[in-house]
Each structure stands twice: as C-alpha cells, then as structure tokens.
Design a protein with these regions (language model features):
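N-terminal secretory signal peptides that target proteins for export/translocation
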Residues: 1-7
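N-terminal maturation segment of proteins
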Residues: 32-609
C-alpha cells in the first residue's frame, strides 16, 4: 500500500491540475437520454464536420506530419509526400493564427449538446491549440539547431527513416523533397540569426554538440552522404524501378547534395562559428531574457499543472529519498553495503558488462527484442487492449547516436513500418541491468501499447487516433513510467534482483530529473552539478535544450497512480486493473485533467452497473 506521504504527495498534485483546459466542457458520466441525443443531431454533425476539416487543414500546414501519419490518400497525400514543412517564422505565425481561430470556434461549441467523444475531442483540441498560442512568445528561447531536434538532424532523420520508399513514385517524391532540404535549412538559419540578434544563444557546450553534427554531415563526399547512400540501400530491391532509373535517381540525389545541401550546411557551420565566441557556460534558461517566464510556461505545458518550480524540486527530493531507501535494502542483499547509491550501482553495473572481445551491440539488440517478446506475454493478463502493429528494436543511426536518448517512433498506419524502439549504444559500457525497464518504458507495455493502440482506435476521430492534437507529455511519459512501476508491482523481477535494482534506478533517475531540471533552470545549477547528481552528460544537455520536459515523467506517473488508487478505493470488488488500463489507453493522448474527469466518470458508471 502507498505510504501516507505518497498519498499526500499525489493529492497535492491532483489539486494543482489546471482546470481551465476543459473551458466549461464537462464530460458526462452516462450517455444522454435518447430524446436529448436526437435533438442534438445537428450540433453533433456540425462539430464533427468542423473538427474534421480543421484537423485536415492543420495537417496540411505540416506535410511531414501528413507523411508520418499518412493522413490523406490519393493525389493529395501524394502531393504532400513531395513537400517538406516550412521552417520560417512566417509559417510559425500562420500556425498560431490558425490556432487562435480554432480556439474561437471551439468557444462557439461550448453551449452545444456534444456527446462524450466530442467533448473529449474538444478538450484535447483546445488544450493543444492553447499551448501553441501560449508557447509562441517563447519560441526563440529554444535553440533552433538543438542537438536533439534541430533541422540539421531532423531533416536527415525524416528523409532516411520516415519518408516512405515503397515504389518508384516514392523515389520521385524523395528527390522532390531532397531538393527542398537546403531551402528549409536556410529558413531555420534566418530564425537562428534573428534569435541570436536578441541574445538568444545556446550555452557553449550545446553549440559544440550541434557543430559536431554539422561537421559530421559534411565530412563524407556527396556520393557517400547518408541522404544518398540510404536512397541506394532502400531502392536496391525495388521491383518497379529499373536499374537505369535507380542509377539516375542516385546520380540526381548526389548532385542535389553536392550543389545545394552541402552549401546550406556550410552556411549553418559558418553561423555557428560566428556565435561561438559569444556563448557562455551558464546552462539554465534563466540566462536568457524573460527566461523565468519561459520556464514557467514550459512547466505548464509539460506537466498540465500549476506546480511551481520550487514545488517540483521538493517533490523530486522526496521521491529520491524514498527510492534510494528501497534500493539500499536490495543492494545490501547483494552484498553491496558500502558507499552511496551511485557508487554501489556502478559496482553492480560493472558485474554485468559484456565479456569478450567482439562487438556486443548486435547481441544487446537481440536481447532487447527478446525482452519485448517476453513483456508481450506477461502483459496478456493485464490488458484487454493490445496493439496489432508489431514493434522492433533498432540501434540509433550514427549521425544522432552521440547525443541521442532511447525513444520510440510510431508504426506507419499502412503497415509499411513497425513501431520502433530506438536504442543508442555508444559504448564502451552499456546499461545492462536497466535494459528490461527501458524495454517496458519505450515498447511494451509502455509507449508502443499507448501510441500504437491510439493509432489503431477506429472509434476515435481520425485526428485523435493519429495524435494530430497532442494531449501532452505528462500523459504519454507518465504512462511509460507507470508501466515500469507496474512491472515491479506485478513481480516481473522475481528472482532478478539486479534487474529490479535497474528498474528502481530508472525510477530514481526520473525523480532526480525533477530536481535537476528545476535546479538547472531556476536555481543556478551548472552542467557539472547536474552530471554529478547522476544525470549524465547527454541527459543533462537534453534538459538544457528542452526545459521542463523532464518533469513530465514523474509528475504524470504520480497522477496516474493517484487516479488508480482512487478507483481501487471507491470501487472495491468492482475494480478491474485491465479495465483501468483500457480507460487510460482507450481515450488516447489527453491532458491529465481530462484523464482525471474520465476516471471520475468511469467510477460513477461502475458504481451504477
């Protein structure tokens, strides 16, 4: 059972969820009477017609989103598959203007008798669009060429991993897009220069990470560039592409890279060299003009709460103490009693490092795949909803691996690409005892269950199943961390104390994130302080360029646990863990305040059943 302190902590979090996101839209506990539903047919149709059309127009703003979701079909999808999303400030303003218009139209539906699905859709759309509007004043606080999501790597990753390559038409679309890469990079460069003119520049250690990526991209000759070699690899067995046409496509791609793309990267390289002397070592966003307001907005965006940075910092310290006490007990059972938690975990890690002289990476990937298959079997009794799409484990590509974190990408809706759990394997040491918890988090029953199930939900509006309007990081990352805790609760680590310690270490890591993220951005922490606190260099640098996001994991998990505890307490024998999981996953990505209302309504329904 949860401790009194844990229950109090969760209650505090529950009380701080932003109620304004629903903006007067109350989610019903039971279906409306038939007469009311009949009278509401016209408004229902009006909302569906508007929301479907608005979502389509929103996707049209981002051709890359259209491709990753395959949102359209026929000629329109084919047209969008030939375009890259503009990266200009003007395009950003166009999106903000559209978001404002969307919120205005949603206001008009407040008084309409929408059904339950529509009310949830309206709440999710409103939350997402309001964030677009609220985030706009702080867009320049984010370094355009971030080592995690900047276009210098984002465009390459999209072209080599996401752009479909099924037939000759896709090859032609690839070349059309390739011809736009330099334009998009130049648009981003204009924005970066504008931000730099306002003293919005990254810390030196962040800039140098991005410089490394640009240098790495420019190192090979055009014919050996990843944008060319990937095209060659992906077309090698293409049935409707003749050898002559394939050779011509590769030659054209080589020419585009040489004549357009390499010069654009050289321009970015020169810009980075120009601002390098102006960079400093201060890590937090507070170093920038209006940085405190930017961080407050980031917390609201990523946690869906009104928690302050100080409150999050305190929650983190409390959770760290709780988890470390549990880890100490298990470490002592393995004979590791001397030193702090960090020292003893390093000693444990050393015991499980790969042995032998060969490259251990292929075997590690194979082990990850075995762990995912095992998790699928273990999850069978805990979930009614399961994804149809498979999930694969792959190593992060070389261009991004030096600074990448493990992550998950969705399967293609048409089945041409599985869900993918991407693992960075930099070496020379590897997180062997944390492999199971990472597999649960990123794949099964974590992100793959959550996101692939949502994509496959035929009873949701298309814009929700395809996550066109996000419900926020706290739901998605909170769920993934919740599944790590679930594995511990369900005894998946029975007879595997090192694996259990790896899982607890992962949870400790997320608790420390609360402390480190708020420390970096509001308490003057240096990069080295965060590293010394146990974050690691790559993770620390991620928090620097993505303020607030690290808070989503633990805050989201605590909220889901609080809601589960509430359901168990109020429903007693009527409570079902698989049914609770169905509820959390079945609505798709929603803000946590919306999830709270859904759980309350579900409890009311179950009591009446």
């Amino acid at each position: 059972m949860p401790s009194t302190r844990q229950r109090s902590l969760r209650a505090t979090i529950a009380a701080l969820f932003i109620p304004a996101m629903l903006a007067g839209v109350s989610l019903p506990a039971v279906a409306a009477p038939a007469a009311t539903q009949a009278a509401a047919v016209a408004p229902y149709k009006a909302f569906d017609a508007w929301s479907d059309k608005f979502a389509e127009d929103w996707v049209r703003l981002s051709p890359q989103l259209a491709t990753s979701t395959q949102y359209f079909s026929g000629a329109e999808q084919a047209r969008l598959d030939r375009e890259l999303t503009p990266l200009s400030a003007a395009h950003r303003q166009k999106a903000v203007a559209m978001a404002r218009e969307g919120v205005k139209r949603l206001d008009g539906f407040k008084s309409q008798p929408l059904n339950e699905t529509q009310k949830i859709s309206a709440a999710v759309m409103r939350w997402s669009l309001q964030n677009v509007i609220a985030n706009e004043p702080f867009e320049d606080h984010a370094f355009v060429f971030s080592q995690f999501s900047g276009p210098q790597i984002g465009l390459v990753n999209f072209m080599t991993n996401t752009h479909p390559m099924r037939n000759a038409a896709d090859v032609d679309s690839y070349l059309a897009r390739l011809d736009q890469v330099a334009v998009r990079l130049d648009e981003a460069l204009v924005r970066a220069k504008g931000a730099a003119a306002k003293q919005m520049i990254p810390p030196r250690f962040i800039l140098e990470r991005a410089q490394f990526q640009v240098d790495h991209f420019l190192k090979p000759a055009a014919a050996e560039n990843v944008l060319v070699t990937t095209l060659a690899q992906r077309t090698a067995e293409m049935k409707d592409l003749s050898p002559e046409a394939r050779s011509a496509a590769i030659a054209r791609a080589t020419g585009i890279v040489e004549q357009k793309i390499r010069p654009s990267y050289t321009r970015v390289q020169a810009f980075m060299a120009e601002i390098h002397p102006k960079t400093g070592i201060v890590a937090g966003i507070s170093r920038l003009p209006n940085g405190a307001a930017a961080y407050k907005r980031a917390i609201e965006n990523f946690t869906s709460t009104q928690l302050t940075a100080d409150e999050i910092h305190t929650i983190g310290l409390r959770e760290v103490a709780r988890i470390e006490a549990e880890m100490d007990k298990h470490l002592r059972s393995l004979g590791l009693a001397d030193g702090n938690i960090e020292t003893r975990m390093k000693q444990l890690d050393a015991r499980f490092q790969p042995k032998g002289e060969g490259d251990p990476r292929p075997a590690i990937i194979a082990s990850y795949n075995e762990m995912v298959r095992d998790a699928e079997r273990r999850s069978a009794s805990l979930f009614n909803l399961k994804p149809r799409a498979p999930v694969d484990v792959r190593r992060v590509p070389p261009l991004t691996e030096p600074s990448a974190a493990a992550h998950y990408t969705l399967p293609a809706p048409d089945g041409s690409r599985p869900g993918i759990f991407w693992v960075p394997l930099r070496g020379p040491t590897f997180d062997m005892i944390r492999m199971r918890s990472l597999a649960y988090h990123e794949a099964v029953p974590g992100h793959h269950f959550q996101l692939a199930i949502q994509q496959e939900m035929s009873d949701l509006p298309k814009f929700r199943s395809q996550r066109i309007f996000s419900g926020g990081s706290a739901h998605s990352e909170g769920w993934a961390l919740y599944t790590e805790r679930l594995a511990v609760e369900q005894g998946w680590y029975k007879d595997d104390v090192p694996g259990l310690l790896g899982a607890l270490g992962s949870e400790l890591f997320r608790a420390r994130r609360l402390v480190a993220d708020t420390g970096l951005h509001t308490k003057g922490w240096t990069r080295q302080q965060a590293i010394d606190y146990g974050m690691g260099a790559q993770e620390t640098e991620r928090y620097v360029v993505w303020p607030g996001q690290a808070n989503a994991y633990m805050i989201g998990m605590l909220r889901i646990l609080e809601l589960r505890e509430k359901a168990q307490k109020e429903l007693g024998d009527k409570y079902s863990l698989p049914a609770f999981h169905d509820l959390v996953l079945g609505a798709g990505s929603v803000p946590l305040d919306v999830l709270g209302e859904l759980v309350d309504n579900w409890i009311a329904q179950q009591k009446k059943a």
